[in-house]
C-alpha cells in the first residue's frame, strides 16, 4: 500500500517485533500519533504565539509548561527542546569551544559529538576505553592531564556518554564528572540512550548539561531532543541575540542564538509532549526492561559459540553480540549466505537485525512484552537448531 505517489506505507511496527538497535525507544505512543495528525501542518504550534514570541513561552498548547516539566524531570534547572541530540551537542560546543581548543570525548563517543566539536573549531581527543569497554574515571584523569600538558590549556568541555551506542554499557558518569570538575571542566552527558529509557538524574550525575534524543528514546517524532542545564550555564548557552541591523536598526527580542530563535515548531514538539506522560511512567519499570534484555541474551548464549560483547549480566536493553562462531559459520555454507538470519527471523515476525549480519551485530529489546521477549529468544534458538548449531 502506498501512502503517496511512490512512497510505500511503513508497517514495520504493526507487522513485526522490531529489535532495531536505534528504533526501539522512538516508537510513537498512540497519543503521539494522534497529536502528530492534529499538528502535522508546518508552524502548527504558532497559532497562539504571543509576545515575547518564543517557543518556550507558548501557553497553548502548553509548551512553556512542558519545558519546565522536562527540566524538573531530569533534575536540572532549565531545558530547551532541540532538533535531535546532535543539536544539543552543537549548541554547547558552539558556546564553549574556540578555534584550536582541545575537547575531551571518548573512544565510545558518537560521531555527532566529534562533528559538533569540529564545527566549533575544536580538536576532539579521546579517552580510551578499558578492556571491559568502559570509560573509567582514572582514564579520564590521565587524558585530561595529557591534554593540558600538550596544549598548555584546560579543555573547555568534556563529553561522556551515559550509555554508549557501541556496546550499550552504562558508564560511571558521576565519577567521571567529579574528575572533570576538579579541573573546572564542564561536562556534557550524552543521554541519547538513557533519557526516556531509564531513570536519569542530571544533578546526581554531576552533569552540567544533559542531552536526550526524542526520536531515539522519548517516543517522539524526528528530529527531536532535549538540552537541559543548570543555572550556572543557562545564561551563557541560552544567551539571547544582540544583533542589530545596520540599515534598519532592527533587533530581535529574546530569540536565543544557539536555538536559532525557535526549534521545534510543530509535530515534533507536540509529539514529544503527548508521549511525555508515558515516558515518565515507563522509566519506572527499567528493571523489567533489563530483565527482558537478559532473557534474550541468555537465549543467544545458549547457542554454542555465541558471545556477548556488552556487559554481562546486562544493564541495558541495547546489546552487542558476537555470532562469528555460531550463525556466521552457518552463513558460510548457506545458500542465502549471511542473509539467512534476518530472513528466518522475518518469517517468525521479527525484524531489526541488519540483513546480512551474522558476525557482530546489535539489537534492542526495549518496549517488548513478556510474550514478545519469549518469542524472540525462542526464535533465535530455533533458527540455530534448524541450522545444525548446538544448544548448550
From Swiss-Prot:
Its cofactor is pyridoxal 5'-phosphate. Homodimer. Interacts with SepRS. It catalyses: O-phospho-L-seryl-tRNA(Cys) + hydrogen sulfide + H(+) = L-cysteinyl-tRNA(Cys) + phosphate. Transmembrane segments: none annotated. Converts O-phospho-L-seryl-tRNA(Cys) (Sep-tRNA(Cys)) to L-cysteinyl-tRNA(Cys) (Cys-tRNA(Cys)). Pyridoxal 5'-phosphate binds at residues 85-86, 190, 213-215. This is O-phospho-L-seryl-tRNA:Cys-tRNA synthase. Its EC number is 2.5.1.73. GO terms for molecular function: Sep-tRNA:Cys-tRNA synthase activity. GO terms for biological process: translation. InterPro entries: Aminotrans_V_dom, PyrdxlP-dep_Trfase, PyrdxlP-dep_Trfase_major, PyrdxlP-dep_Trfase_small, Sep_Cys-tRNA_synth_arc.
Amino acid at each position: 500500500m502506498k501512502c503517496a505517489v511512490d512512497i510505500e506505507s511503513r508497517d514495520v511496527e504493526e507487522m513485526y517485533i522490531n529489535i532495531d538497535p536505534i528504533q526501539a525507544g522512538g516508537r510513537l505512543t498512540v497519543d503521539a500519533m494522534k497529536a502528530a495528525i492534529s499538528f502535522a501542518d508546518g508552524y502548527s504550534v504558532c497559532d497562539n504565539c504571543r509576545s515575547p514570541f518564543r517557543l518556550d513561552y507558548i501557553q497553548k498548547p502548553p509548551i512553556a509548561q512542558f519545558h519546565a516539566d522536562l527540566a524538573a524531570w531530569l533534575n536540572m534547572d532549565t531545558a530547551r527542546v532541540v532538533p535531535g541530540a546532535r543539536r544539543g551537542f552543537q549548541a554547547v560546543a558552539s558556546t564553549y569551544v574556540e578555534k584550536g581548543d582541545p575537547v575531551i570525548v571518548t573512544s565510545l563517543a558518537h560521531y555527532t559529538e566529534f562533528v559538533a566539536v569540529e564545527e566549533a573549531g575544536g580538536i576532539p581527543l579521546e579517552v580510551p576505553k578499558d578492556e571491559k569497554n568502559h570509560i573509567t574515571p582514572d582514564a579520564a584523569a590521565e587524558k585530561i592531564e595529557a591534554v593540558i600538558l600538550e596544549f598548555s590549556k584546560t579543555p573547555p568541555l568534556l563529553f561522556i556518554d551515559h550509555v554508549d551506542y557501541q556496546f550499550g554499557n552504562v558508564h560511571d558518569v558521576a565519577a567521571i564528572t567529579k574528575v572533570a570538575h576538579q579541573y573546572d571542566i564542564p561536562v556534557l552527558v550524552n543521554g541519547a540512550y538513557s533519557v526516556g529509557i531509564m531513570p536519569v538524574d542530571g544533578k546526581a550525575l554531576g552533569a552540567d548539561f544533559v542531552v536526550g534524543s526524542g526520536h531515539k528514546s522519548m517516543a517522539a517524532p524526528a528530529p527531536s531532543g532535549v538540552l537541559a542545564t543548570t543555572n550556572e550555564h543557562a545564561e551563557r548557552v541560552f544567551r539571547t541575540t544582540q544583533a542589530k541591523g545596520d540599515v534598519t536598526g532592527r533587533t530581535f527580542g529574546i530569540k536565543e542564538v544557539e536555538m536559532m530563535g525557535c526549534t521545534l515548531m510543530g509535530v515534533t514538539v507536540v509529539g514529544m509532549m503527548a508521549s511525555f506522560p508515558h515516558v515518565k511512567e515507563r522509566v519506572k519499570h527499567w528493571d523489567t526492561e533489563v530483565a527482558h534484555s537478559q532473557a534474550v541474551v541468555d537465549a543467544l548464549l545458549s547457542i554454542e559459540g555465541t558471545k556477548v560483547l556488552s556487559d554481562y549480566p546486562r544493564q541495558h536493553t541495547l546489546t552487542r553480540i558476537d555470532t562469528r562462531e555460531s550463525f556466521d559459520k552457518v552463513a558460510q555454507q548457506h545458500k542465502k549466505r549471511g542473509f539467512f538470519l534476518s530472513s528466518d527471523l522475518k518469517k517468525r515476525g521479527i525484524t531489526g537485525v541488519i540483513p546480512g549480519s551474522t558476525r557482530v551485530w546489535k539489537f534492542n529489546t526495549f518496549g517488548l512484552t513478556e510474550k514478545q521477549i519469549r518469542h524472540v529468544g525462542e526464535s533465535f534458538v530455533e533458527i540455530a537448531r534448524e541450522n545444525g548449531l548446538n544448544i548448550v
